[in-house]
Every structure is written in C-alpha cells, then in structure tokens.
Curated annotation (Swiss-Prot):
Belongs to the universal ribosomal protein uL13 family. This is Large ribosomal subunit protein uL13. HAMAP family: Ribosomal_uL13. The gene is rplM. It comes from Mycobacterium ulcerans (strain Agy99). GO terms for biological process: negative regulation of translation; translation. InterPro entries: Ribosomal_uL13, Ribosomal_uL13_bac-type, Ribosomal_uL13_CS, Ribosomal_uL13_sf. This protein is one of the early assembly proteins of the 50S ribosomal subunit, although it is not seen to bind rRNA by itself. It is important during the early stages of 50S assembly. Keywords: Ribonucleoprotein, Ribosomal protein. GO terms for molecular function: mRNA binding; structural constituent of ribosome. The keyword Ribonucleoprotein applies. Pfam families: Ribosomal_L13 (PF00572).
C-alpha cells in the first residue's frame, strides 16, 4: 500500500480563537503559526496548505516587556531615497496593536509560495470582539508559566 500523500481538498478546516490577554508575544505567534500551517494534524505535509483559521482577540493586551516596547524597532521603507522610517514597538502598539501581533505571527510562517495563502487564514483584532461567530470558533488555550 503506498504512503498517503494529502492533497489540497482532503483536509477539513476548523476555526480557532486565541485570547492574547497576558500571553507573551512570541509564544502566541508560535502557537498561531502552528495552527495556521496545520502542524497539529496527523496529515501535515509542508507542501500542502492544510491548516486551520485562527482568530486572535485582545491583541492590545499581549505581554511585551518594557525594554522591548522602548528599544525594539520596526522598520518600513517608502521606496524613495531616505524613506526609511523607524518606530518603536511601543509607538506601534498604541496605534495599531493588531499589526504588531500579525507581523510577529507572519514572521513565524515559511517564506514560500504557500505563505500568502496561509496568511489569509489569520484574523487579528485589537478588542475582545470579532465578526466570526457564525463560524463557531473553538477557544484555543495557550499553556504558559505565570509571569
């Protein structure tokens, strides 16, 4: 009997909701990236997008150390000469906490042809609410040591 090789339509996708309140940003990103890729499933294959949908709520309450809020920089470039913009993570957390969490999760995903397809299954919201109640998302608990 030949070895089973999963195909694109073989997997059923679930919806998970992760509450980011007091969760360390890196641990949140690893857990979300593993769910998005489907590494928790026995039918995981790196060449097939078999992952689940992930909703992250309360992105504004994620745990980041004060030193990183002050010193860690996020860079963006406009494309023009001298167009490099540097902002601290603290400044970005005040304006767009969902983008900080999304950038951390996307950074943990592979950089290949499937990456955009995997990224499209990620939804990040700064507040406690989300518009995906019709999909009946299952709460996903991140196990961590108390800080």
């Amino acid at each position: 009997m030949p070895t089973y090789a999963p195909k694109a339509g073989d997997t059923t996708r679930s919806w998970y909701v992760i509450d980011a309140t007091d969760v360390v940003l890196g641990r949140l990103a690893v857990a979300a990236a593993n769910l998005l890729r489907g590494k928790h499933k026995p039918t995981f294959a790196p060449n097939v997008d078999g992952g689940d949908f992930v909703i992250v709520i309360n992105a504004d309450k994620v745990a980041i150390s004060n030193e990183k809020l002050r010193n860690k920089r996020a860079y963006s470039h406009s494309g023009y000469p001298g167009g490099l913009r540097k902002r601290s993570i603290g400044e970005l957390m005040e304006k767009h906490p969902d983008r900080v969490v999304e950038k951390a999760i996307v950074g943990m995903l592979p950089k290949n042809k499937l990456s955009r397809q995997i990224q499209s299954k990620l939804r990040v919201y700064a507040g406690p609410g989300h518009p995906h109640t019709a999909q009946q998302p299952v709460p996903f608990e991140i196990k961590q040591v108390a800080q």
